[in-house]
Amino acid sequence: MRQIPFRTGFGYDVHRLSDGYELWLGGIKIPYEQGLEGHSDADVLLHAVCDALLGAAALGDIGVHFPPTDMAFKGIDSKILLERTCQLIREAGYEIGNIDATVAAEAPKLNPHIPEMRRVMAEVMGIPISAISLKATTSERMGFVGHREGMAAYATALIAYASALE
């Protein structure tokens, strides 16, 4: 059976905001009075991107490859998880086309940080910065995001069989 060379994936992640944690989003530290709780550095954006990539390649999800029960990943920098995810994608015979992601957070304002997040993500992923679109939104003070209890991120990824691009 013939397979179409392009595949899309979707990723979603949430983490609780808490005192005593640093806020890491898109691979950068963002000044804020709270951070996100998690087994790793809780970078909700990079986790959603990892899930989108893994989903596009039908390789499971971030919990399969980097389980929260494994102490090797305790406190790990999520840029390492993203780098390893990109390696898995390429080892499976794919190239990454683009990423489109949105972070939902009531505060802090994220738009000033988006250019640096894109730069860092492009460097880690080995793709052009033009292949990464990031947006930030609020939830209009509704739900757990709106009540400043946590943050959420949504991501899509496009990948293609490397052989189809030759």
Question: What positions do the PLM features span?
Answer:
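N-terminal charge/polar-biased segments
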Residues: 1-6, 161-166
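RNase III-family endoribonuclease catalytic core
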Residues: 2-115, 120, 125
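Glycine-rich, charged/polar anion/phosphate-binding loops
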Residues: 9-11, 140-143
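Short active-site-adjacent structural elements
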Residues: 111-112, 141-145
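Short acidic capping loops at alpha-helix termini that bridge into adjacent secondary structure
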Residues: 128-131
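Pyridoxal 5′-phosphate
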Residues: 134-138
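C-terminal edge-of-domain segments
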Residues: 145-164
